[in-house]
Amino acid sequence: MGAGEKMAKVENWIDEKNGFSRPIAGRLLTHCFVAMFLGFIGGFVWLIALADNVFHILPLPRMEIQVPDQKELIRNAHTGTITNAMYVMAMVALSPWLRFSQRQAKWVYYGAITMLWGNIIGYSTAVFTPYRGIQPIFENDIANLFSYFTFYAAVIGAIITTGICLNNAIRAARTN
């Protein structure tokens, strides 16, 4: 049974408090912790770039490792990935107060995953293109193509998840 078939069988997207059910929250948090791990790897690459392509932690020998000369973009691959993971973790933690419907929980779940992985791929591939993945210039630049469209998908995911969470937060603020 594949992951899609397992997800199709999950009928309880929310728990009795209308937050994410434990299995759904666990799956979202798994994506978040994988993203955090990848963000930490980006941090090591950023440190190597800041140290002029030298990796030297005692007692290991000094090693020269070539990384792209895009320190700002490498930093973004580190901080952006971790920030997005924390944002999705906050959605999971706050879900009981946001009181999702079944439909909203599904939209937030898939939107959050799209946002998270779109940004991970976008930040990572933007390092290898002069256009940073923010301009639709695709001539002989597959990295920019990848980065641009994954950022585009991430924006759609962010709008969906943030919109639903904002709507439900406003609704919660208005209730007694």
Please report, for each region that a protein language model flagged, where it lies by residue:
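Hydrophobic cores of alpha-helical transmembrane segments in multi-pass integral membrane proteins
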Residues: 28-51, 72-95, 110-127, 151-166
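N-terminal amphipathic/basic-hydrophobic helices that include classical n-h-c signal peptides
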Residues: 1-8
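Interfacial loop-to-transmembrane junctions
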Residues: 137-150
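Juxtamembrane membrane-water interface segments of multi-pass membrane proteins
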Residues: 8-27, 46-71, 88-110, 128-137, ...
